[in-house]
Amino acid sequence: MVKMSKKVAVGLSGGVDSSVAAYLLKEKGYDLIGITMKVSCDLDVSEDAKKVADKLGIPYYVIDLTEEFKNKVIDNFAEEYLQGRTPNPCAVCNKHIKFGALIQKAKELGADYIATGHYARIEEHNGRFLVLNAKDDKKDQTYMFYSLTQDVLKHILMPCGEYTKDQIREIAKKIGLEVHNKKESMDICFIPDNDHGKYIKGLECRDRIKPGNFVDKDGKILGTHKGLIYYTIGQRKGLGLSLGKPGFVIDINPERNEVVIGDEEEIFNEGLIAKEVNFIPFDSLENPMEVEAKIRYSTTKSKATIIPYDDGKIKVMFKDKQRAITKGQRVVFYIQDMLVGGGTIESIVK
């Protein structure tokens, strides 16, 4: 349990969740400071966040992490697409920025802990910090926290995890926060129009975007694609092909600059290999384990077995074939409401 005398830096985004998180902690008597991370010259949420800090009567700081965000998140985002993978920038940001660089900056301001408005619960059991599903299943964000280590988890508070979204909005309205009915942001924060292709074309790496061939699984040329960054596994729309039947992206080959097209049944696979794996309740996987797994943020959990593999990687075998397992995305594991861990999808087991 956190001692009330400890200083807590609350990450204020200007939205309702982080604002109410700050209010809930202030009501419990914590010594708070509000901080907003600046990650883009074009993205400024500090005005709403400053209003919330003033309303709650807490000190407020803007932390400039623009350079760190570019180096860790944006560059990785572009490189993954250029390599034919589909990145998850939010997972990268959580690991390196929100719960990496931001924690370090908060410590420099004298804070012992950082709090956010995320929907997840962190509890200590027998000296180990566990991540549990939020009370609001529809808003649960635990998928994004699989990579957090024990050293990081012990410094994080997530009060919104004990409430539903409707309850959070009601609290905000009750205490007079202007953001109580603010619309949620669903897109990638640094790509507000959700057009990642246009965004990457505006970066220095634009010259690496090259047209290439659409091919079938036998290598027969079907047409010309605009560049690997525009395609992802399972994609059907926007291919510009006339095949006489529906065609789906079943593979992307960066070495040959080819996008492989096939039938829908070919995007269903039974397993995957994951790298960069992290576990939360324990340090490493020694034996096969039955879990429920998610291969992207928006999917439901599916029964699977995780198996130790070479070089710290793991094999994940699903009870039922999964649609569009995608390299670069994250696979995350659960046992009931406990987050077990996860990793980056490296390859597909067919």
Swiss-Prot record:
Catalytic-site annotation from UniProt: 93 (nucleophile), 189 (cysteine persulfide intermediate)
Amino-acid positions noted as binding ATP in the UniProt annotation, renumbered to this chain: 11-18, 37, 117
Disulfide bonds: 93-189
E.C. designation(s): 2.8.1.13
One Gene Ontology molecular-function label: ATP binding
Reactions catalysed, as given in the entry: S-sulfanyl-L-cysteinyl-[protein] + uridine(34) in tRNA + AH2 + ATP = 2-thiouridine(34) in tRNA + L-cysteinyl-[protein] + A + AMP + diphosphate + H(+)
Gene3D superfamilies reported in the protein's UniProt record: Adenine nucleotide alpha hydrolases-like domains, HUPs, Translation factors
InterPro entries: MnmA-like, MnmA-like_C, MnmA-like_central, MnmA-like_central_sf, Rossmann-like_a/b/a_fold
GO CC annotations on file: cytoplasm
Marked site (Interaction with tRNA) residue numbers: 118, 329
Protein family membership: Belongs to the MnmA/TRMU family.
Protein name: tRNA-specific 2-thiouridylase MnmA
Organism from which the protein derives: Clostridium novyi (strain NT)
